[in-house]
Amino acid sequence: MEYREGLIIVSACEAGEVFEAVLRGKSDTELRRIASFYDYLEIMPLANNHFLLDNRTVRSEESLRHLNRRLVQLGQELAKPAVATCAVHFLDPDQELLRRTLLAATAFAAPGQAIPPYYRPTADLLHHTPYLGP
């Protein structure tokens, strides 16, 4: 990629190609090929992807845990950090209403989202991912 130098490329949330490839059960070879492009892999709290349970893409919270564990494993295989993030779309929880209002007329509206995408400190992220270990 011509302009990649100096950039940090992250794998993104469930809409990113790495998570999507893990979700779709791509082969280990294909997963490594896709993930090798990124500098680090993002892990979201389960509640961020709870909609995948609601729309029946996955069957259980354990399935969501498995997806995150696979992302961590993939990072280890490629010597890339897997980082707990929270897909921040606004800074403070009280800004959620403004964001929902702006999204209401778009295809991206997500009523009833379990965890609004505001900034969460490290302690909160660790609280939501104990199954990944220390």
Regions found by a protein language model. Give the residues of each.
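Phosphodiester-processing cores and adjacent nucleic acid-binding clamps
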Residues: 1-134
